Amino acid sequence: MIDKNFWQGKRVFVTGHTGFKGSWLSLWLTEMGAIVKGYALDAPTVPSLFEIVRLNDLMESHIGDIRDFEKLRNSIAEFKPEIVFHMAAQPLVRLSYEQPIETYSTNVMGTVHLLETVKQVGNIKAVVNITSDKCYDNREWVWGYRENEPMGGYDPYSNSKGCAELVASAFRNSFFNPANYEQHGVGLASVRAGNVIGGGDWAKDRLIPDILRSFENNQQVIIRNPYSIRPWQHVLEPLSGYIVVAQRLYTEGAKFSEGWNFGPRDEDAKTVEFIVDKMVTLWGDDASWLLDGENHPHEAHYLKLDCSKANMQLGWHPRWGLTETLGRIVKWHKAWIRGEDMLICSKREISDYMSATTR
């Protein structure tokens, strides 16, 4: 699993470090002693986890657009990283209907820019390309998708992630082929996670942030698709998988340069209705929800991942169940409302996760 000693002094470059997942990953890496530089647009929300935990004081932060190839290349070349996590993205399904050009240019060409930079700069040993479970051609199957299933995507966001996977595959085959690993020395993996939730997410049109905003303002939560099933998991679950993949790529790049799924156990793939009912109970104070009867852009109703490969080959397993995850989210958010030091609270969350046993 995660080897904290491995990360001591490692030079790590994170794109998208100002986002929800990127902030949690950057904080975790700095906690383990890594020297971290981030490259991203300004924090996408106000408030943001990046600002609240004062990440600017813990790492080098370069504000820039992943679509600006020269700026990205110069930033990476100056830093000379050993490991790269590529998270920069337009991450919202509904926004992708409104901004398809920006979604594709960021998620597809951004990936091209990152991988071309890795090819040109050299001396980078491990690249973890973060996409999404929505990269798969979703047929609303009752079983989970495996890493060798076809890429697809109904909406611009999901399809852009499928395209990003194809980009990574092409670069791996053409420039970072495991068969020629001794020549190039680069391990390149793509990682795919389900619906990631946790404290510190204020994004628009995401279920948990929408619920918390409504509760905080004493308003009913408006729910679009109560019967949609998603593979819900605490943000630290897939991040732990990404970290393990990076470790393996660094030491055995040829063996682990492929796609990896990171999702919850089957019993934690629950309906939206289940989530909101649990959150109502955990929050208390007369919290409630209401069904939105309006028509909305298409979103998948059923999507699960098969994580057998990560379980068997990486020794990765989920540690927190859905009920504990939701409880931790409410606890984290109420601590923020009370004005507690969220850097301390977030470090404690990481420590709790690291010490938890697999379920």
From Swiss-Prot:
Pathway as given in its UniProt record: Nucleotide-sugar biosynthesis; CDP-3,6-dideoxy-D-mannose biosynthesis; CDP-3,6-dideoxy-D-mannose from CTP and alpha-D-glucose 1-phosphate: step 2/5; Bacterial outer membrane biogenesis; LPS O-antigen biosynthesis
Chain coiled-coil ranges: none
Classification via Gene3D superfamilies: NAD(P)-binding Rossmann-like Domain, UDP-galactose 4-epimerase, domain 1
Cofactor(s) listed:
NAD(+)
User: What class does this enzyme belong to in the EC scheme?
Assistant: lyase
Bilayer-crossing residues are: none
Keywords in alphabetical order? Lipopolysaccharide biosynthesis, Lyase, NAD
Which PANTHER family is this protein grouped with? DTDP-D-GLUCOSE 4,6-DEHYDRATASE-RELATED
Q: Which NCBIfam families match?
A: CDP_4_6_dhtase
Q: What is this protein called?
A: CDP-glucose 4,6-dehydratase
